[in-house]
Amino acid sequence: MPAVRDQAVPVAEISVSEIGHIEAIFRYPVKSMAGDRVEAADLGWHGIDGDRRLALRRTRERGGFPFLTAGKLPDLLRFVPLGPEGGAPGDLPARVRTPEGHEMEVFGEELAAEIERRHRAPVQMMHLRDGIFDQASISVITTDTIEEIGRLAGVDPDVRRFRPNILVRLLRPESFQEDRWVGGVLSFGEPGEGPRVNVTMRDERCAMVTFDPESGRSAPAVLKAIVRRNQNHAGIYGTVIRTGRLAIGQTVRLHELAEA
């Protein structure tokens, strides 16, 4: 486990309240592929150890965002990265299982060819030491928000649609409570000892939430429900200001800060 380190937040705390506990922790070794649900994980400056450290680069892309995501190839969500046998948590995956059950080396030509066949354009697996993230290195959502979206959309409230790093179960159930966390700090575990995340922005959603993680089929009602209910936001993004160990069951506290 890495030593706990801090980055100071340059404003004073005005209140601290216990809001819930960690219900689940996820990491996604390959961007847009299936994730791992883990019991515990080290949280470093660039997010959860092993999270989104690999991504498929579109080799013909010369401008903009070069990496292939499920927004362009929904089938990616059904590819499952497999860790090395006997490997440590956070190790890069050694193989990937396709939706049809075939296992291929993660950096091998066979996997690249399989993705190319589906995407109809060449790709290359890349290792990015600090990870590749859309907005920030940590995302958090609550069980209440997911359940409310499922109710409004008439679909199973599957957390995997939302691809969070941390799923929180609140002490006082309330959907979309995450919106009020922006500008504050979340801490995890024992007071003064566990990791901390500065909540920087609401998580604006895209078509990826519509895709069923098992079948890949689209349910547009999911995104429509988020748009109608909460201006297309569900969950939050944050940056790490104190590293440490995350574990299921840890207490989650919200530190509200005075305005700078």
Describe every region a protein language model picked out.
Residues 2-260:
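Metal-cofactor-dependent catalytic cores
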